[in-house]
């Protein structure tokens, strides 16, 4: 940490005798550690020296070159890629929309359920953004009624609520944090099984040298990029397509009825709100 700011590392290839030290990239000051290119014993030893350099300076996160083969050496020294979770939560609504597009789910027809074990700023922001164009949006979270009521008052959105013990029938269930995966198509937002590719402007040649997603996460963490200056380029679902079990026809119909009943409750609540305005 330097002056209250967490110093992030930057792993660079040594080509002409470069020395470890500070380096500014995309407006952010990094602690640069140089390592040899290629693979083999010499490259592995060089990676270990670079990792030790960052470790001694208490650097916990570093941006690595594209397809760098010795990231595990750094991990053993406690140096990992920048955490993606803060950016992923900030871009949750856009990630969900990308996943919907990949699955061919039209906002005006798809039933989307947002599931969480507790309320969070990320859940509320995603619900608020998605309620603008997703016609059938449901919340499955403790005190979800409060958020649904807020969205009805603020946005006029018809957001339904489901109890956490109800079976969820949705075209896509989006799970925040450690919410148990329901049946059907699931987007486990915080899982590493979901791959998200990001983009931003003015990276220049840096995007060709370093892992672009790691670099963007580092820029976001350093406040060099705002969330609205970053976009989601692609979302890749788990290999099995996010399918978590197959519902029988009876259970599927029961789940559909639960969703419809929740929708009717939301419509009734909306009418009640209108009468009291």
Question: What function would you assign to each model-found segment?
Answer:
Residues 157-209:
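Rossmann-like adenosine-cofactor binding region
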Residues 28-107, 202-241:
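Glycine/serine-rich phosphate-binding loop and adjoining beta1-alpha1 elements at the start
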Residues 102-166:
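Glycine-rich phosphate/diphosphate-binding loop of Rossmann-like nucleotide-binding domains
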Residues 20-22, 71-78, 147-153, 168, ...:
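Short loop/helix-cap segments at secondary-structure boundaries that form the rim of catalytic
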Residues 1-2, 51-59, 75-76, 105-108, ...:
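Flexible, charged surface loops at secondary-structure boundaries
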Residues 13-14, 37-38, 64-67, 115-118, ...:
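Structural motif
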Residues 1-27:
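N-terminal basic/disordered segments at the start of proteins
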Residues 21, 34, 188-277:
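Adenosine-phosphate binding glycine-rich loop
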